[in-house]
């Protein structure tokens, strides 16, 4: 199957301010994707990791490496933060797509379990 990569997310954000940066005609894209072999759509631009579906296809929105946007700032505007940067790992398996958001900011260990 195909992995489709677009810069602007083809789905709205939970924040009205961030939704301004979404793809302009997502319904046109959805119409083209129906019945296609696209397994996942990857995007970014918002600097906030997220997930959704478009035409029944999973959409993974990557966070930002340079900075992270504050999704809790909500509809007051846009606030960039120096913490909470991340990237997304995508693994393709027969019949499955798995995504994982990986934080890259400094953090403290709460607990650790060593196996093996």
Which residues does each predicted region cover?
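Binuclear metal-dependent phosphoesterase catalytic core
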Residues: 53-116
């Amino acid at each position: 199957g195909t992995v489709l990569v677009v810069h602007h997310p083809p789905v709205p954000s939970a924040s009205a301010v961030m939704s301004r940066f979404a793809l302009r005609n997502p319904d046109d894209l959805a119409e083209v994707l129906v019945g296609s072999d696209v397994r996942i759509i990857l995007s970014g631009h918002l600097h906030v990791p997220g997930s959704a579906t478009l035409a029944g296809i999973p959409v993974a929105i990557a966070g930002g490496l340079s900075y992270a946007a504050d999704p809790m700032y909500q509809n007051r505007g846009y606030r960039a933060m120096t913490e909470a940067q991340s990237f997304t790992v995508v693994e393709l398996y027969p019949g499955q797509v798995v995504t994982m958001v990986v934080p890259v900011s400094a953090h403290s260990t709460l607990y650790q379990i060593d196996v093996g």
